[in-house]
Amino acid sequence: MSASDQGAVGEDATGEGTPWHCVVTGALGGIGAAVVTAAKNAGYRVTAVDQTPHGHSAGSDGDGQTGDGKRNGDVAVVGNIPADLPVDYVLDVTDAEAAQTTIDRIEADQGAIDVLIHTAGILRADAALDGDTDAMRASFEVNMFGAAHVCAPVAQRMCERKRGAIVVVSSNAGTTPRAGMGSYGASKAAITAWARNLGLECAPHGVRVNIVSPGSTDTPMLRGMWPAGEDRSADVIAGTPDQYRLGIPLQRLAQPEDIAGACLYLASDNARHIVMHDLRVDGGATLDS
């Protein structure tokens, strides 16, 4: 698909005929990195944001936030990342003040944000029956509050300019219960609901907010849940009836590029009349529940 097909080239937020400026959070993760690559290939000017300037954090779920939801060292650094590193700005999304400062800096340095694709998040495996409130707080700090710290101030700027698109990567676990994923599912349900409310409030200003909800995707996040050295893809595809988990009708895991394509579609002018939509990209795993 060409850049013009994706709507990545045209009048940007300044009214000039230049490539649109797309900011991607969680840019080092499996999905985030695929979004960065796809956006660049589609003709966007891309600004990559992650918690660490290179590689995955220790315990990372593959999208740049540590698996226990805690800060990983000096992560609230803003800007001035060496040019040879893949991340343009370093941000811990749980730090609201740093998020505001980073957004200010990005727009000052790179220009107004036309598109935001927020992929940052963590995955914790914990049972709701355990009532582990620490796990709940950790999941919500990143998956819910972290998204709000980034998306709300960007949306405010877009509303002032009367244009823009935001895509929030959530999960099909936000709408379909998963045994052993209590805090993760709850946090994703929360961000899905919040993003739809944000979309409702932004729509009168010409700003579109949508959600992409992946299913099982072949990323470090998913493989990090399996025993070391084991490939559990076949089990995921087949499903686990004893845990009331359906398999994947399409008989394959999603690839990060599948999720990236959905994100870019919703960000593009091809989706100009779509808002508050939750697009499932899970191979039919939730039977569209």
Give the residues covered by each predicted segment.
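Conserved glycine-rich cofactor-binding loop
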Residues: 28
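Alpha-helical segment proximal to the catalytic Tyr-Lys
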Residues: 156, 200-201, 272
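Residue(s) in the substrate-gating loop at a strand-loop-helix junction
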Residues: 171
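Active-site helix of classical SDR
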Residues: 151, 187, 195
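Short C-terminal tail/terminal secondary-structure segment
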Residues: 2-10, 176, 264, 275-289
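Short, small/polar-rich loop/turn modules that mediate ligand/substrate recognition or access, typified
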Residues: 203, 208, 274-276
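Substrate-binding pocket helix/loop in short-chain dehydrogenase/reductase
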Residues: 127-128, 132-140, 230, 244
